[in-house]
Amino acid sequence: MSEINSIANGTYTIGQTSATNFVAGHGIKIDEPSAGTVRIANDETVLYDSSALISMDKALGTTFNISEPVTNFEKFKVYYTRFPWTDQCPTHQIQEFDATVPVNVIVLHTSFATSTATNTSWYYCAETITDVSGTTWKLNSCSQMQLPNGNIDSSHIYLKPYKVIGINRISGGNE
């Protein structure tokens, strides 16, 4: 017979009633979604999820809201895609950031290649997001650089975040 004991808010032990209990380690979430069912998973919280990507051609100055500050977590992941889409670029990408480092700006980036009959070019794109210590994030600037000639075209490409996930809650929110 197994049992689950709550030994503190958000901390559980699992084990046999007469055997050694095993404690869920930091970053592991154990819950009981229904009677007699135990779910063990990573401690992740969805802070923003939009299947409708920001539809503007130009994202500069656009804001979006997350449900709570990422500083309530050890890390956070941003899922994003390039807009407009092309066959040469990865469609969806993920970057993970350390939320314990006090920053207010993050940079999403991607690189991709295009090819024509006479030329193959590598592109690098970077998008800055400001105010990430709060709950209203702003898409601030985006630039594209064509390598190797270094031409910059800031009106051509945008990176669109569509999901933000907090990992391993450390404080605040709905613990």
Language-model segments: which ranges?
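Hydrophobic/aromatic beta-strand segments within beta-rich folds
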Residues: F76-V78
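Extracellular jelly-roll beta-sandwich "head" domains, especially the C-terminal globular C1q domain
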Residues: T114-E175
